[in-house]
Structure formats: C-alpha cells, structure tokens
From Swiss-Prot:
InterPro entries: FAD/NAD-bd_sf (IPR036188), Lycopene_cyclase_b/e (IPR010108). This is Uncharacterized carotenoid cyclase DR_0801. SUPFAM superfamilies: FAD/NAD(P)-binding domain. The keyword NAD applies. The keyword NAD applies. Keywords: Carotenoid biosynthesis, NAD, Oxidoreductase. Disulfide bonds: none annotated. GO terms for molecular function: intramolecular oxidoreductase activity; oxidoreductase activity, acting on paired donors, with incorporation or reduction of molecular oxygen. It comes from the Bacteria. NCBIfam families: carotene-cycl.
Amino acid sequence: MAPFSPASSDVLVIGGGPSGTALSAELAARGLDVQQLAPHPPRPFPATYGAWLGDLPTWARGCAEQVWTDVRAYTGPQPTSLGQPYALLDNAALLRTLRGLADWTWVEGAALHAERSGAGWTVYGAGGERWQTRLVVDASGHGALVSPVRFPGGAALQTAYGVVARFRRPPVTPGSMVWMDYRTPAPELKRGEATFLYAMHLGGDRYFVEETSLIARPAPTRAELRRRLLARLSAQGTPPHATESEEWVAFPMNAQAPAPGGVLAYGAAAGRVHPVSGFQVAGALSDAPGVATAIATALCQGKDAAAAGWAALWSPERRAAREVHLLGVGALLGLERAELPHFFGTFFGLPREQWARFLHPDTDAGTLARTMLRVFAQTGGRVRLPLARAALAQPAASGRALAAAAGLKI
C-alpha cells in the first residue's frame, strides 16, 4: 500500500534551495502550517552564490562570507572599476538565518507531480508517497518539476565551469573580485563562443575562478569550459597548484513570464532568473515576504492562493519588464564573439546608476528600455547593426519598449 499523509498542510513547498527555503520561512512566519519537500535533509546550499550587496535584502547582507569593494570588469586591456560592492554568500549562515525565522516541517522525498484534489492539492512522490496540501508551490529550481516555463526559440543557456583552488601566483589582482574578464590570453579563447573569467580572491592563496558563457544556444559544454579555463590560467602563468572543489552550472536565461494558473512556482522554477546576468537568489530572498503575505491573505479569506501568489510574483509591471529583457537576450544572442566585449564596454561605460539598475532584479520596463537605447546610441556600428536586427525581429515588443522608454502606456 502506498504511504499516505492524511494531515493536510496549508502549503507544501517543493525544493530545498534558497528560494524554497526563503518562501517556506516567510510563509511559516505568517502562521501557516508549511511543509518543505526536498530529496535531502536541511544542508548548506551547494552552489556558489554571489550578488551585488545592494540587491540583497538588509538582513541577508549579514550572511555575506566576503564583500569586495575592488570589483572590476575587463572588456579590453585595462580594467573598468565597477564601484559597487559585491558579496559572496555564506550558504550555511543563510540557511541558519532562514531556519531561525520560524518553525516549519522539512520532509525528505522527491516529488513527481501534483494534482488537484477537491479544494486542495495532492503531491505524489517517487517512493509512492502522497502529501495533501491546500496549496503547492514548485520551487525546485531550473528543472521546474511540476510547473515548466517556456523559452522563446528554445532554451538559451548560461554555462560555467569553475574551481576553488590554491595558486602559487595570483590569477587575478589580490583583494579583487573580477565580475567579467573577456581578455583572450590563450588561442583557445579566440575560437568558438565568447567566454569570460569570473573570479574572486577568497583570501591567502585561495581563489574561485570560473570560465563562463553568458548566454548561448547551443552553449559550451563542461569539457569545453574546463579546457578554456585551464588554457587561460596556463597562458597567464597562473595554473592552479591544488584544486579544492569544482563547480558546473547550466541553466536557461530566456524564460518568458509564465501564464498565471495551475501550480504556483517560485524562484527559478517561476522564470525569475535575470535574463542578462543569470542572477536570481537576491530577487528570491527579496520577493519572499510579499509573495508569502499574498498567499497567507488569500488562504485566510478563502480565495485562490495560487492566483494571489502569481499576481504578487509576476505583476503587470514585471511582465512588461521581462518582455524588454528578452529583447536584450535577442540582442546578445545576435552578437558575434568579438562584439560582446565591445557591447559590455559600452554598457559599463554608462553612469553606474544606469547599468546597476539594469542588472537589478526588479527594474521597470521604461528604465530598462532607456538604458538599452543609451547603449545602442553610444556603441560602435559593428555592434549597433545586430542590436537593430534583434529589435526589428520583434516589432511589437520593440514598439512597447519604445513607448515604455517614453513613459507612454499602450
């Protein structure tokens, strides 16, 4: 006989990452009976999470393992100082802080699918389990177990391979964080897709170094990026002395704003990945209180909690902003390898408040569109042409973006 949980929770959150844990904590803090379902017990999140310090909610800034003020980008031979603090999150501290906000039940198991069951939901597990709940939330990450999102033209991926290692010679300037280094010291880096170095000095002789493909379709593989990283480090005379750990990431960047309805999703499962940077944790931590309040209010009033959650997570303003972001994705995908450094050279040459707002997780469509127009106006002709092609390929969306830039509503 299949295991069955007769006790119905108010909310069952699928996923054990930062997004699911943050939402579970905020829901429980509002007096709801919450179950969080993950294939493992509570444990520090395994990925490396960085964020602009100012994008994190105030409480989360105390969970920073390290903060750099020397943050730079190389889109040519000389560095551009970005002048904005950047944080590496301490995942154990983040989990500890979230778990300390409220009490909720952590359930070990793997969800397969969810179905409507009367006024609530039944979630079916891989081991034959069944969990009943008034509301189910899919926060399972980029895999989106029960609420898949759509990617226009197919998923365009960000892929990256990195290591934490010890170096006899520093691979980047000690004390610095390199957000993007498009220089090509090795022949390997002059072929194929453009990739860049993302690096953090962790103290002493320890560094995190990662070769990243910002967005591509198809994207470079783990093996390709590993070769590129090692070629880069070898060419600049800084091979790793002792590798402590490896990291590989691959996730889609071009999610459409999901249609409301069905299973409520959260975080990356809801498409809340920034389509230009790939960041999502700062946004998920910031969104959790508002989404939790909307859900709790709807459940208390006997209203559709999933609809309330979707409305809080994907407002009309956010949907308009995502459409503008996807125009930017089309532009990036249309740029040749040699054009990307020029594009970002222009981007980071804008006043800091302009490019920083573009990279912020919650910027309005008009501000985004005006920044894109400034980049178009200031960049060189060989970059401007593919940007124009990308805009002309989506005339309706481009028209709405221009209207937003002008402050018009259409």
